[in-house]
């Protein structure tokens, strides 16, 4: 009898140890649609994975999948449906799905991706959480790239009217409405398609942060850069996790994971974008692209023409049950504080 009990106890202990070992080897599979050298991967997702492993004391590891699982717009559902555990993408790639996230794409928010990203996350937590726009997944973080500017191969842009009828690639979201207001013909394509549409004449130019011009090797396809102080737009990104996978982690592991996500990831991402933009500007000038900045008169007209964007977002926020004016005021105050 004693041998039988001992055997049972041994089996139970062995099973517990096996389960513990299995739990200790939790691996989060990250879907990726960008080259491994892109700042999102090299300077954000991969370092975040190391931070997760360190924060969880090796109990949770992060693995970037070697091949894309779908087009960029599919990545929210790729996480939601459990095809991958973690994904990132652009909110504006799925028009109509998100509304509150457009706040981070409004014109003239600032020149620092780090400041805007942190302020954006804080605003999301404080004002947008109850609207649950990311329902079906665990929202790990939100962030933006640096200020968006105008690049083209046709003519220098000195006044707002110079933009009329130019075919410009835009990434979706609020910049689509902005481009139409300015008389631009918007061309929709994910960023990895930029080289193709510019060299094939599908687009005359592109709206991008400085970083993206050398990265996507489109510097030879462009002649002019128009800098917009505080940015014509930013692009809003999400980092999300399959809800069931998140809930499968222990409470301690969840807390550790979130300690390096949320604001910590927004800071990491924003800082990486700012550094990449600085390097991008150096490359743009070295490539011989003519750089100009809109003067005060052009900026005054631009701000007047684009005032509709804020009003439109405030209406969307109201529809979602959010005090948009309070949220936007808070976000701008945080950006100003963080930019000092």
What function would you assign to each model-found segment?
Residues 13-23:
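C-terminal segment of classical bacterial N-terminal signal peptides
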Residues 1-9:
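Bacterial N-terminal signal peptides that target proteins for export
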Residues 2, 122-123:
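Polar helix-capping/helix-linker motif
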Residues 23-116, 123, 127-340:
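N-terminal secretory/targeting leader peptides
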């Amino acid at each position: 009898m004693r041998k039988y009990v001992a055997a049972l106890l041994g089996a139970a202990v062995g099973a517990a140890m096996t389960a513990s070992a299995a739990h200790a080897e939790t691996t989060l599979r990250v879907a990726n649609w960008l080259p491994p050298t892109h700042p999102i991967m090299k300077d954000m997702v991969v370092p975040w994975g190391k931070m997760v492993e360190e924060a969880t004391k090796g109990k949770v590891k992060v693995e970037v999948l070697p091949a894309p699982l779908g087009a960029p717009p599919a990545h929210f559902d790729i996480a939601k449906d459990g095809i991958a555990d973690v994904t990132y993408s652009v909110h504006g790639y799925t028009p109509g799905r998100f509304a509150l996230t457009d706040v981070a794409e409004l014109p003239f928010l600032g020149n620092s991706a780090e400041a805007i990203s942190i302020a954006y996350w804080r605003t999301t937590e404080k004002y947008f959480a109850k609207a649950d726009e990311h329902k079906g997944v665990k929202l790990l973080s939100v962030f933006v790239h640096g200020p968006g500017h105008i690049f083209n191969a046709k003519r220098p842009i000195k006044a707002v009217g110079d933009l009329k009828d130019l075919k410009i690639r835009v990434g979706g979201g609020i910049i689509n409405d902005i481009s139409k207001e300015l008389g631009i013909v918007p061309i929709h394509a994910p960023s990895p398609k930029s080289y193709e549409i510019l060299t094939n004449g599908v687009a005359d130019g592109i709206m991008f942060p400085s970083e993206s011009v050398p990265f996507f090797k489109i510097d030879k396809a462009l002649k002019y850069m128009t800098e917009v102080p505080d940015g014509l737009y930013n692009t809003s990104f999400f980092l999300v996790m399959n809800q069931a996978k998140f809930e499968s982690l222990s409470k301690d592991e969840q807390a550790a994971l979130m300690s390096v996500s949320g604001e910590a990831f927004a800071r990491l991402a924003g800082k990486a974008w700012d550094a990449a933009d600085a390097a991008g500007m150096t490359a743009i000038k070295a490539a011989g692209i003519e750089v100009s900045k809109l003067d005060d008169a052009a900026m005054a007209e631009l701000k007047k023409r684009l005032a509709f964007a804020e009003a439109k977002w405030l209406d969307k926020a109201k529809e979602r049950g959010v005090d948009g004016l309070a949220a936007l005021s808070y976000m701008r105050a945080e950006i100003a504080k963080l930019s000092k």
